[in-house]
Amino acid sequence: MSKAVTTALAFSCDRHTPPTNFAAAAAAAAQSGVVDELLIWDQMTNFWPRQLWHPDNTPMAAIVPDLDSYSDAFAMSGYLAASAPGIGLTISTDAIRRGPAELTQTMMTLANMTEGRAKVMIGAGEAKQITPYGWRRSEGLARLEDQLKGFNALWASTEPVDLPGNHWTFKQAWLGQSRTHRPHIWALGGGPKLFYLATTYADGISAIVPCVAPTPESWAHTVSTMKAELERKGRDPEQFEFGIWFMSLVHEDADLLERALDNPLMRWMAGVFGRLDQSAWDAEGIEPPLPRDWHYAVKLLPVTWTESEIQGLLRRTTHEMAQKSFVYGTPESVAAQVEQYVEAGATWVSVCDILPLLLDPVDAQAGLARNIEICARLKKAGKT
């Protein structure tokens, strides 16, 4: 590697867990010296149907009543910034549920709290976060354009701003003169329109592996294509960031990992999320478990799934598909797999380890140390 990659520790903050527990974990990450940022997800509900969260599938279900009681990501980010000074904050959100002026104001505030180490990744949105609450997922990309253009306009001017938009229009919009620290704004996701918006207006882009880039070579192709587009637009591609979330299972016990791949919770994730475009399974000679035009971001509403629909998907999702849907192994093995994507152009990485959902509480708590070890290995590799 030519330089050390930026590392982010994924935090899924729920309301069942005392906030002080997250503060302690954030402090441990900050003190490690190898974790640059926390990644906090702005979610309304999780990926799994409620029927799958029970003690037959995981001992954690006897302790945590549900997986959907998320904390507000922005409120928790402020709390964690105060609890662990020196750590950076990255929030992933969608373009629909907050206005561009409000989001810009919030991110300016977090940038001040972290001395410039604040980032927001904005996607076109997931139906599960949007449709049940009265928003329209179909407006996602148009609203993303408004978000990116609105942020840039508000940051660039200390005078009132007029800006036409698709859904939000500024008329003498003003957030004052303070410009202490600029937050970073990235696009989150994929597709031609989102790539166009990212290379035109954003500071970077992030995607999830292996779900959209199952090999380092496929990721390298994405990076090279986007860098060429940045150059065509007169932007410096070396100033643009490329981030990856790794959907991961991390543990020292290989047998435990193989059993985890057959657990209904992980098999479900492989079915709905293992390849975001279901048709992508065709290239690997695998029959998709859902219709080829089915995409989780547009179609997945976990609360509405019936028991028969759930069991049907689990039957159609094979062990091989689960193996191809996660980056999994020991901390050393996962770090080595992540390094390949860094060599292929990733500049920011977060190992999103969801295995603790299946573990007993003591083993689940050890997940923090495993993921910090991965960050340490990545930092060490960046110095060689």
Language-model regions: role of each:
Residues 3, 99-239, 292-295:
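Internal, glycine-rich beta/alpha segment that forms the wall or movable "lid"
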Residues 8-20, 92-101, 179-190, 248-251, ...:
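Active-site mouth loops of central-metabolism enzymes
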Residues 5-11, 36-40, 89-93, 118-122, ...:
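Hydrophobic faces of well-ordered beta-strands that scaffold small-molecule active sites
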Residues 17-29, 103-106, 188-197, 261, ...:
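Short, acidic/polar
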Residues 139-175, 216-343:
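An alpha-helical appendage that flanks or caps ligand/catalytic pockets
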Residues 1-83, 182-183:
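N-terminal beta1-alpha1-beta2 module of alpha/beta enzyme domains
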Residues 57-89, 228-229, 365-384:
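Alpha-helix-loop-beta-strand connector modules within alpha/beta enzyme cores
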Residues 37-70, 126, 131, 209-216, ...:
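Glycine-rich, proline-tolerant flexible connector loops at the mouths of alpha/beta enzymes
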